[in-house]
Amino acid sequence: MTAQDSIPSLEQLVQQKRVKEEKAARPKFLSKAERARLALERRQKEVEEAKAKQNDKLLDLRKRTFTNHLENNELADDEKKSQVSSVSSNNSGTESSATDEAFSMTIRQRYMGIKPPVVKKRRRNADKKFVFDWDATDDTMKDAETSASPEATIAVFGRGKLGGFDDQSIRKAKSNSGLIQRLLQGTEQDKARAHELIQLQEKRAKKIDWDDVPWREKPLEAMKPRDWRILKEDYNISIKGDDLPNPLRNWEEAGLPSEMLKVLKKVNYKEPSSIQRAAIPVLLQRKDLIGIAETGSGKTAAFIIPLIIAISKLPPLTESNMHLGPYAVVLAPTRELAQQIQVEGNKFAEPLGFRCVSVVGGHAFEEQSFQMSQGAHIVVATPGRLLDCLERRLFVLSQCTYVVMDEADRMLDMGFEDDVNKILSSLPSSNASEKDGSILATANSSSSRRQTIMFSATLPPRVANLAKSYLIEPVMLTIGNIGQAVDRVEQRVEMISDDSKKWRRVEEILESNRFSPPIIIFVNLKRNIEAIAKQLNAIGWHAVTLHGSKSQEQRERAIEQLRNKTADILVATDIAGRGIDIPNVSLVLNYNMAKSIEDYTHRIGRTGRAGKSGTAITFLGPEDTDVYYDLRVLLSRSAKAHIPDELRNHEAAFVRHAAITQ
């Protein structure tokens, strides 16, 4: 290598400088510990610089003070020397001349009134400044601090006061400590109170900052409006109304009677669902409510629990008032849903001494009249059958103060609107809101004002008009999105049009062993239900059927077999799509697509209930183009749904069918 090669060129130097500048300008990542260390070093450096400046100022002050002192001493010495020199010079003259001069001056001052000259006192420069530096030997408090206790030091300022003011913290600590000592020497109740005071003092000493603690870990008194908003967001709760209570965090904070808490523990209700968290506090305040919630959300317990608590505060049913009818009426669109509500209601009613009776079609009037004669606190009925019983005078609703309409949208779709209006109009206390406000004022002032509750999966205009007619200032409660399927359900759509291909696909799904009983298969036509059930029985599955042509006894037996796991598969029409609660349904198979997206939503809502996951498989064909658009929109909103390309790209999936027909 030559000497010229070892010497870098100008371009290399410029390149190296550019690289260094880029490297210096590039931000350097520092960890949290390094940032803390650098901040601490900067702080220490600032403190040291401040101390150095203070020491320099102090040293300069001392130097200037010492210099002034020396100057004053030198000036005083010069004055003394001048006086001595003048005296000595006078002495060197003749004593007679000095005496004569002094004598003549004295005579002039005496007879002529001449005042003697005033000699101005010269002020020293050192007197203008105050030195704040004290010597250590000047400190007189050391002996007092070592010889006297803090209590004695404070006591010298008066009767328990410090400088004329009470030391509140010391006085409170003394009083609390004395109280705790006295309580610890008392009874067991006093000792418990003492331990509470000790815990309270420990909490105050800790001074926990609850702002950064999640709402689940906070005590109830530490909850702030922000925490309640987060709770509502976590459970998809949207509520509108006046003077609304906060949702429930758990059963223990709900303020329920101890007997009800025991029942909840017995039926294994560990935590309230979303609608139970929001609806129960509202209903306990005797407010009217419109609840819009997804299927399988626990609506039944949401109104049964407050209903039973309210009934427990009314006079007990005896022979003197039993003929006046029940205290509460629950309306359901189908027999199966009514009987299911009765079963769920008796879980809470029977342990507390109340009776819940169902009045549905398929049973003799005499049988239901006998049940009512025994006394019933709650009646669960279908609108048609209840209206027949009222018209036949089998029982009355003279003391009914609670009305619940479950699946209100389904009741109106099934043509029960007139029956519902007649039933509500026949009740003793009307909640119909009139413009003059007289009924409203009377209802609010009366202790027997009727409380009306309406639950629905959707809110069509007819349901809104019904609520407007019979509910007073209702609270509007929405859980999730209206008309949305449960997020725990995995939705799959398969494009199959031929019945033979559908059946082969059913066999493949069942033989995959991915889904365990119970399983529900929905079919649109009743004549196809029995054929599919026979084919299922032929390949080794125990299938039962449910449709409108079945008697009430056959319906109840089919559902009971599926619940008891004596049957594996239920083949049904949309009659089983709403309100039927069969636990642990792993698969809902839509052999035929539902005629509306609402019915589809309720069908797949039979699985994924009570916090568990489920699967819904739908066979889609060309005859279902009317629901392509709504189905595509519904599937696109779910994170657990798969949309096949045939559906996504189909022309009918981009325009709503109602818009085309118009």
UniProtKB/Swiss-Prot annotation:
<feature type="binding site">
    <location>
        <begin position="293"/>
        <end position="300"/>
    </location>
    <ligand>
        <name>ATP</name>
    </ligand>
</feature>
<feature type="short sequence motif" description="Q motif">
    <location>
        <begin position="249"/>
        <end position="277"/>
    </location>
</feature>
<protein>
    <recommendedName>
        <fullName>Pre-mRNA-splicing ATP-dependent RNA helicase prp28</fullName>
        <ecNumber>3.6.4.13</ecNumber>
    </recommendedName>
</protein>
<dbReference type="GO" id="GO:0016887">
    <property type="term" value="F:ATP hydrolysis activity"/>
</dbReference>
<feature type="region of interest" description="Disordered">
    <location>
        <begin position="70"/>
        <end position="101"/>
    </location>
</feature>
<dbReference type="InterPro" id="IPR011545">
    <property type="entry name" value="DEAD/DEAH_box_helicase_dom"/>
</dbReference>
<dbReference type="InterPro" id="IPR014001">
    <property type="entry name" value="Helicase_ATP-bd"/>
</dbReference>
<feature type="compositionally biased region" description="Low complexity">
    <location>
        <begin position="83"/>
        <end position="97"/>
    </location>
</feature>
<dbReference type="InterPro" id="IPR014014">
    <property type="entry name" value="RNA_helicase_DEAD_Q_motif"/>
</dbReference>
<comment type="function">
    <text>ATP-dependent RNA helicase involved in mRNA splicing. May destabilize the U1/5'-splice site duplex to permit an effective competition for the 5'-splice site by the U6 snRNA, resulting in the switch between U1 and U6 at the 5'-splice site. May also act to unwind the U4/U6 base-pairing interaction in the U4/U6/U5 snRNP, facilitating the first covalent step of splicing.</text>
</comment>
<comment type="similarity">
    <text>Belongs to the DEAD box helicase family. DDX23/PRP28 subfamily.</text>
</comment>
<keyword id="KW-0963">Cytoplasm</keyword>
<dbReference type="GO" id="GO:0071013">
    <property type="term" value="C:catalytic step 2 spliceosome"/>
</dbReference>
<dbReference type="GO" id="GO:0003729">
    <property type="term" value="F:mRNA binding"/>
</dbReference>
<feature type="domain" description="Helicase ATP-binding">
    <location>
        <begin position="280"/>
        <end position="477"/>
    </location>
</feature>
<keyword id="KW-0378">Hydrolase</keyword>
<keyword id="KW-0539">Nucleus</keyword>
<dbReference type="GO" id="GO:0000354">
    <property type="term" value="P:cis assembly of pre-catalytic spliceosome"/>
</dbReference>
<keyword id="KW-0347">Helicase</keyword>
<keyword id="KW-0507">mRNA processing</keyword>
<keyword id="KW-0547">Nucleotide-binding</keyword>
<dbReference type="InterPro" id="IPR001650">
    <property type="entry name" value="Helicase_C-like"/>
</dbReference>
<feature type="domain" description="Helicase C-terminal">
    <location>
        <begin position="488"/>
        <end position="651"/>
    </location>
</feature>
<dbReference type="GO" id="GO:0003724">
    <property type="term" value="F:RNA helicase activity"/>
</dbReference>
<keyword id="KW-0067">ATP-binding</keyword>
<dbReference type="Pfam" id="PF25430">
    <property type="entry name" value="DDX23"/>
</dbReference>
<comment type="subunit">
    <text>Component of the U5 snRNP complex.</text>
</comment>
<dbReference type="GO" id="GO:0005737">
    <property type="term" value="C:cytoplasm"/>
</dbReference>
<dbReference type="GO" id="GO:0005634">
    <property type="term" value="C:nucleus"/>
</dbReference>
<dbReference type="InterPro" id="IPR000629">
    <property type="entry name" value="RNA-helicase_DEAD-box_CS"/>
</dbReference>
<dbReference type="GO" id="GO:0005524">
    <property type="term" value="F:ATP binding"/>
</dbReference>
<feature type="short sequence motif" description="DEAD box">
    <location>
        <begin position="406"/>
        <end position="409"/>
    </location>
</feature>
<dbReference type="GO" id="GO:0005682">
    <property type="term" value="C:U5 snRNP"/>
</dbReference>
<keyword id="KW-0508">mRNA splicing</keyword>
<dbReference type="Pfam" id="PF00271">
    <property type="entry name" value="Helicase_C"/>
</dbReference>
<dbReference type="InterPro" id="IPR027417">
    <property type="entry name" value="P-loop_NTPase"/>
</dbReference>
<dbReference type="GO" id="GO:0000398">
    <property type="term" value="P:mRNA splicing, via spliceosome"/>
</dbReference>
<dbReference type="Pfam" id="PF00270">
    <property type="entry name" value="DEAD"/>
</dbReference>
